[in-house]
Amino acid sequence: MARFKHVARKLRLAAALKSNRAIPIWVSAKTRLRVRRGFSLRNWRRSKLKNI
């Protein structure tokens, strides 16, 4: 990827980076382990982002 990135592309990459994290501990505690992990986790090698 080029070094110079447009601001819109940089914002989309930052949003994807922030959303790619595990769920907080209090969520699994509040739901009594019905929600164990986030299903939207993405690995940089396995699946690529679209429209960026």
Curated annotation (Swiss-Prot):
Record flagged with keyword Ribosomal protein: yes
Transmembrane regions listed in the UniProt entry: none
Alphabetical UniProt keywords: Ribonucleoprotein, Ribosomal protein
Cysteines paired by S-S bonds: none
Protein's UniProt keywords contain Ribosomal protein: yes
HAMAP family per record: Ribosomal_eL39
Cellular component GO terms held in the UniProt record: ribonucleoprotein complex; ribosome
A GO MF term: structural constituent of ribosome
Domain of life of the organism encoding this protein: Archaea
Family under the similarity heading: Belongs to the eukaryotic ribosomal protein eL39 family.
Organism encoding this protein: Desulfurococcus amylolyticus (strain DSM 18924 / JCM 16383 / VKM B-2413 / 1221n) (Desulfurococcus kamchatkensis)
Name of the protein: Large ribosomal subunit protein eL39
Xref: InterPro entries: Ribosomal_eL39, Ribosomal_eL39_dom_sf
Entry-linked NCBIfam families: PRK01242.1
GO biological process, one term: translation
UniProt cross-references to SUPFAM superfamilies, sorted A to Z: Ribosomal protein L39e
